[in-house]
Amino acid sequence: MNDFPWLTIIVGFPISAGSLMLFLPHKGNKVNKWYTICICILELLITTYAFCYNFKMDDPLIQMSEDYKWINFFDFYWRLGIDGLSIGTILLTGFITTLAALAAFPVTRDSRFFHFLMLAMYSGQIGSFSSRDLLLFFIMWELELIPVYLLLSMWGGKKRLYSATKFILYTAGSSIFLLIGVLGISLYGSNEPTLNLELLANQSYPVTLEILFYIGFLIAFAVKSPIIPLHTWLPDTHGEAHYSTCMLLAGILLKMGAYGLVRINMELLPHAHSMFSPWLMVVGTIQIIYAASTSPGQRNLKKRIAYSSVSHMGFIIIGIGSITDPGLNGAILQIISHGFIGAALFFLAGTSYDRIRLIYLDEMGGTAISIPKIFTMFTILSMASLALPGMSGFVAELIVFFGIITSQKYFLISKILIIFVMAIGMILTPIYLLSMSRQMFYGYKLINVKNLSFFDSGPRELFLSISILLPIIGIGIYPDFVLSLASDKVESILSNYFYG
């Protein structure tokens, strides 16, 4: 047990401070915006301080654990803790949410409620990553969906209600499978039902039952990740949402699905995961090719970036399915890497729209001269997305490739085939990313229009772009900073498998 409830404070502070904002007298939009940014910065500083002084990187066990009896009747505990798997995602959540709050400055309609929803989402996401109790994990998982739905339905494009409804139908529907899995896995094979993840990790199940549990959790996490064919909510949602919301979706929400796959499917159900891992590899490979092939056909700029997210998530699925030390480490690194890259691309797409008021690529062209700073940052981050050496994505994808090669589970011909198809996907990636830049910034469509000029990136946008670019380059140059956080936990998870 931890002496000081750091994690409880970290989870509860954003939503508590956000609730306070709703009840205080309205002092104007500017006050609400700066209040939210200050809360996010303070939360990030508290989190960083707590982890620096309490987290030991060479310890694969749960650290900073907190265990409080909550509801006696259900034997329900408020049980929090972190390890190498969750620390990176929690810090990523804090960083991206802070930048998203800064990106939300143009929001003026109901800005107080908008910023409250961002802070409520912040608490739900950190709660999901730090939960050590299955029912608490489910509650935090659902808590995070409510503000996302409201952010999607109240702020965005003309079809925002349609996209928000589609999002909630997919995610709430998949949550039924998550709840059934949580209740089933906690009630099975014990005189005293337990929801403690540490105890459940040592539990064994009949093969058929373990497979059923695995499929239930897989459906829930496949929607959030997303894994094809359960991905169709994502392009519509990104296409209509405000770009600060898109930053939170691409940077954090998608990573919750991948985190759940490792935390529950892989750690609690190793035998079933071993059986399903070849199918994950196949689906991940198809996903890379499918999304990379579909993306060039998207006229909507944000939808094209959304399909690139689906493609990049394929590498994470393959890394999880490889059941190797490099593969799983590469998947975790890709979770962090794409969190930064995806959020950055959506921010730049949104800030471009604020200036030219166009979202369809075939209507753009010739803006590079008018907005050179946005053009430069968009080009650099497009290079990061296509895994240019020196950027975080390159290292992550390279380690995933190495994980496939070193896997002892698969035959040589299977590994060659998977790598070959993945390589085709990597060839297609520059095609849709570079054509996107060409359609946006090159040509003569807008440059020849008389009396038409655009303001380039201001200090706020430039600061935000550079802030998100620095960790992408930093991880690309020194990936061990992220890998060292999770390496011992990865070894601990893989110790339950016969190969790795």
UniProtKB/Swiss-Prot annotation:
GO terms for molecular function: NADH dehydrogenase (ubiquinone) activity; ubiquinone binding. Its main location: plastid. The keyword Transport does not apply. GO terms for biological process: ATP synthesis coupled electron transport; electron transport coupled proton transport. Its EC number is 7.1.1.-. Keywords: Chloroplast, Membrane, NAD, NADP, Plastid, Plastoquinone, Quinone, Thylakoid, Translocase, Transmembrane, Transmembrane helix. It catalyses: a plastoquinone + NADH + (n+1) H(+)(in) = a plastoquinol + NAD(+) + n H(+)(out); a plastoquinone + NADPH + (n+1) H(+)(in) = a plastoquinol + NADP(+) + n H(+)(out). It is found in: Plastid, Chloroplast thylakoid membrane. GO terms for cellular component: chloroplast thylakoid membrane. It is a multi-pass membrane protein. The chain crosses the membrane at residues 4-24, 35-55, 87-107, 113-130, 134-154, 167-187, 211-231, 242-262, 272-292, 305-325, 330-350, 386-406, 416-436, 462-482. The keyword Plastid applies. It is an enzyme of class 7 (translocase). HAMAP family: NDH1_NuoM. Belongs to the complex I subunit 4 family. This is NAD(P)H-quinone oxidoreductase chain 4, chloroplastic. The lineage of its organism: Eukaryota, Viridiplantae, Streptophyta, Embryophyta, Tracheophyta.
